[in-house]
Amino acid sequence: TSILKEKQENADIAMLAAQYLLTKKMDKEATPVLHQVLEIDPENTPARLQLLSFAIREQNMDEVIKLCAPALEYTPDVLEFYYYMGLAYHQKEKTDEALEVFKKGVNQVTDKSNKDIVSDFYAIMGDLYHIKKMNVEAYAAYDSALVYKENNIGALNNYAYYLSVERKNLDKAEE
């Protein structure tokens, strides 16, 4: 890693060093190298996802947000960054910020997007709308979640539960 002390113009050598450290289970040593990769190449999704996995494992929601925020600019088509940033805000009980991130993520959805992730976006949005007492929007979000994945257990459970609590559309809740 002594070569990494020199200013790099290409992220390839740093990424190679990081991959070597990761294969040797030297995550702590790989972390600053992965940050160096992102300084050189902020669009490097594998490096950012690896750092993100470390932050998630440590349950460091501030770091998750810090890693995801620039990713939304550099790689706006990678839905995982919206997902984890939205979840981090949700865990920090920042409902408005979480909802904003998920809305931006939904705007990036294409025919090629992972339908499970898209369904989860909408399911979580349903939960967030419910927290904000915006039930019409919550039910619309749950409906959208089920369009993308009809057996999304989280969406089905919360949708049915909230309908039963409100005593509305009980036949729909039973479905």
Model-derived features with residue positions:
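Alpha-solenoid helical repeat scaffolds
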Residues: 1-175
